[in-house]
From Swiss-Prot:
SUPFAM superfamilies, alphabetized: Mob1/phocein
PANTHER family in alphabetical order: MPS ONE BINDER KINASE ACTIVATOR-LIKE MOB
Binding site for Zn(2+): 69, 74
Pfam families registered for this protein in UniProt: Mob1_phocein (PF03637)
The entry's keywords: Cytoplasm, Cytoskeleton, Metal-binding, Nucleus, Zinc
GO annotations of cellular component type: cytoskeleton; nucleus; phragmoplast
Subcellular location: Nucleus; Cytoplasm, Cytoskeleton, Phragmoplast
Organism: Arabidopsis thaliana (Mouse-ear cress)
Name of the protein: Putative MOB kinase activator-like 2B
The family this protein is said to belong to: Belongs to the MOB1/phocein family.
Length: 122
């Protein structure tokens, strides 16, 4: 999957997959992570693992890559469908969350850095 000149490979960093395959693999992987009670405890009061933040960061980093791909490769089609307000609103809220809690490194945001800066501008 690509976002401009940036290429995202699956899992081990060597497996190149198409964007639809990447998204499907990602959604399945995220579901597996969320269903794992060792990572996301289901019972109230159960402690989260010490590396919980690492799991969350990894999930959100990979989701950012999907946004980057959509903006680079599909935004004109999104505009044609008159769906840009919905996409922009979802991305804006995502960015506010990951920025507030520093969950995605700035280096990861480079493929759509100008858009990120514009959206986060006070």
């Amino acid at each position: 999957m690509k976002a401009g000149r940036y290429e995202y490979r699956w899992a081990d960093g060597t497996t190149m997959v198409s964007a639809p395959e990447y998204v499907e693999l990602l959604m399945n992987w995220i579901e597996t992570q969320i269903d794992n009670e060792h990572i996301f405890p289901k019972k109230t009061g159960e402690p989260f693992p010490p590396n919980f933040e690492d799991f969350v960061k990894r999930i959100l980093r990979k989701l950012f890559r999907v946004y980057a791909h959509i903006y680079h490769s599909h935004f004109p089609k999104i505009v044609t469908l008159n769906e840009q307000a919905h996409l922009n609103t979802c991305f804006h809220r995502y960015l506010l969350f990951v920025s507030e809690f520093q969950l995605v490194d700035k280096e990861e945001m480079v493929p759509i850095q100008k858009l990120v800066e514009t959206i986060l501008k006070p």
